[in-house]
Regions:
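Conserved catalytic/switch belt of AAA+ P-loop NTPases
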Residues: 82-121, 128-132
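Conserved AAA+ ATPase "sensor/coupling" helix adjacent to the nucleotide-binding pocket
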Residues: 121, 130, 152-165
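A short helix-turn-beta junction within AAA+ P-loop NTPase domains corresponding to the substrate/partner-engaging
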Residues: 127-144
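Walker A/P-loop
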Residues: 3-42, 66-69, 137
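Flexible beta-alpha connector loops of hexameric P-loop NTPases
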Residues: 49-59, 83-95, 140-141
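Conserved nucleotide-binding/hydrolysis micro-motifs of P-loop NTPases
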Residues: 20, 51-53, 82-84, 119-124, ...
């Protein structure tokens, strides 16, 4: 986060094993980018595949558009995003979610931050499915097997180093 250039889009990929603080850091990102004046609010809409699918094959947008609309001004965090793509199933509804998500990243990309998270190997495979999806994410953060408290302390150190004011209660 400390080396990110200010740009108009700040979508991120978080990769790493479970329990490394990806969700915690997504919440911190919301507060950080709000403090920087990039986001309008600190809202974090957390979701997973089962909350994004349409009810039937052909329901292209599923609930992804509702989730993006809810996240406007804040952060949309899709945990275990790699589960959206099942290359073994040609009728998998997750593909339709991705196809509806890519235009929202492009058209509304300056109005929210999308963070997709998952396990490293699975995320790399997932991102190969749609090069358009991968190209919409400007930042990739690799999470090692740190405890959330350590990750929070790393973020605090970065914030302090960059002299960014923040409320410490949000990084605990």
């Amino acid at each position: 986060i400390g080396n990110m250039e200010l740009s108009r889009r700040h979508h991120m990929i978080f990769e790493g094993p479970p329990g490394t603080g990806k969700t915690t850091v997504a919440r911190i990102v919301a507060h950080l980018f709000y403090a920087l004046g990039i986001l309008e609010n600190t809202t974090v809409i957390e979701t997973k595949r089962n909350e994004l699918e349409g009810k039937w094959v052909g329901d292209l947008s599923g609930k992804i558009n509702e989730k993006v609309d809810s996240a406007l001004g804040g952060v949309l965090f899709i945990d275990e995003a790699h589960q959206l793509y099942n290359k073994e199933d040609p009728y998998d509804k997750g593909k339709q979610v991705i196809q509806a998500f890519v235009p929202r990243l492009e058209n509304d990309g300056e109005k929210f931050i999308a963070i997709i998270a998952g396990y490293t190997k699975e995320m790399e495979e997932f991102l190969k499915f749609d090069p358009g999806l991968a190209s919409r994410f400007q930042h990739k953060i690799i999470f090692e097997s740190y405890k959330p408290q350590v990750v929070a302390q790393i973020v605090v150190n970065i914030l302090k180093k960059n002299k960014i004011e923040f409320n410490e209660k949000y990084v605990k």
